[in-house]
Regions:
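Bacterial N-terminal signal peptides that target proteins for export
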Residues: 2-11
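Bacterial N-terminal signal peptides
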Residues: 10-21
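Sec/Tat signal peptide C-region and signal peptidase I cleavage site
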Residues: 22-26
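Positively charged, proline/Ser/Thr-rich regional signature most characteristic
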Residues: 27-103, 111, 181-250
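Active-site neighborhoods of enzymes that stabilize oxyanions during catalysis
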Residues: 27-28, 40, 144-214, 294-308
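Extended hydrophobic/aromatic segments used for targeting, binding, or gating
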Residues: 67, 235, 274-306
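Thiolate-centered catalytic microenvironments shared by cysteine-dependent enzyme domains
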Residues: 85-179, 202, 211, 258, ...
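Extracellular low-complexity, Gly/Ser/Thr-rich intrinsically disordered linkers
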Residues: 233-276
Length: 308
């Protein structure tokens, strides 16, 4: 077993622009794009900007040309689960409705006002990649940075010509409960919740048990961001991830959280920025896991370098 080092989160002294080549597959767009890059490319005919904020926020002002692709279209309330992965046909309909195809350059942006809102864009990006869209990017700093920099805004409700989209799905993005149960002890599990939820000191009301999946390492999603909600540098991200998950880029890894909203950020960064090739996210997360009487839960913190 690879020895994992304790990590500490270092404050960032300066804002760093993260424009990184994709580490996992050929791309025509960086996995994280700056507000300056996006402004310079607004006229690109292949560009599709997905604004995942609430419609009322979108109507108050959005990036010119952006369509309102509310987060709720990408993560359903189903069978008591707050953020279930939609069926493939539903994903196809949503992607096609927004005029996206396999040649599109898709930039996803949203509100960064709260931690959970700031994580929504990555869930949408991972779902698009699950459907076979490779050229997906996150806007560094989201709408908050765009507005702060006084870049142009539009109040026009944008509509794109829809397309008959049929996804090219693979099992590379999402894990289910049975996959984790059948591979406990073989996987590297990354619990991306804040420490007090990992340890069992706190829980969401929708989670029936406190604690975490046995053997999981705690790597909060909030650690990926600077105070201004831009992403940390590639080197800083690698330091955090390697402390918890090791540096074997081919290791089998699953990220999870409470309801499947926080964990996609690390899954996206690990595969698209840091070069990890076998990372899945568990959309059912602790909400589903803790409801299964046969799925073990522990409060033992010994497995987490962040807690030592």
């Amino acid at each position: 077993v690879m020895k994992r080092k304790i990590f500490t989160l270092l404050p960032v002294a300066a804002l760093v622009l993260l424009l990184l080549p994709c580490a996992s597959a050929a791309r025509d767009i960086a996995p994280i794009v700056s507000t300056d890059w996006l402004q310079a490319n607004l006229k690109n005919p292949k560009l599709v900007i997905l604004d995942v904020r609430r419609v009322e926020d979108y109507r108050e002002g959005h990036i010119p040309g952006a369509v309102n692709a509310f987060y709720g279209a990408w993560a359903y309330m189903r069978d008591g689960m707050f953020a279930s992965l939609p069926e493939k046909d539903d994903i196809d309909d949503t992607v096609g409705y927004f005029g996206i195809d396999f040649d599109s350059l898709v930039v996803v942006t949203g509100c960064m006002d709260t931690p959970r809102l700031s994580y929504q864009s990555a869930r949408v990006a991972c779902t698009l990649q699950y459907a076979g869209i490779k050229n997906v990017a996150l806007l560094d700093g989201g709408m908050n940075k765009w507005v702060l920099e006084k870049k142009p805004l539009s109040c026009r409700i944008e509509r794109r010509a829809s397309k008959n989209f049929r996804g090219k799905y693979s099992g590379e993005r999402f894990a289910d409960k049975e996959y984790i149960k059948n591979n406990l002890g073989k996987l590297i599990l990354l619990d991306t919740r804040e420490r007090e939820f990992f340890s069992g000191e706190k829980k969401m009301d929708c989670i029936p048990k406190t604690g975490h999946i046995p053997g999981a390492f705690n790597m909060p999603t909030s650690c990926a961001f600077n105070d201004d909600k831009t992403f940390k540098t590639k080197e800083e991200l690698a330091q955090i991830v390697e402390a918890a998950a090791g540096n074997d880029r081919a290791a089998a890894i699953v990220t999870y959280c409470d309801i499947g909203q926080c964990c996609p950020t690390w899954a996206y960064l690990m595969t698209q920025v840091l070069g990890y090739t076998n990372v899945k996210l568990y959309a059912g997360a602790m909400q589903e896991w803790a409801q299964d009487p046969d799925a073990p839960v522990t409060k033992n913190n010994d497995a987490s370098p962040a807690d030592k």
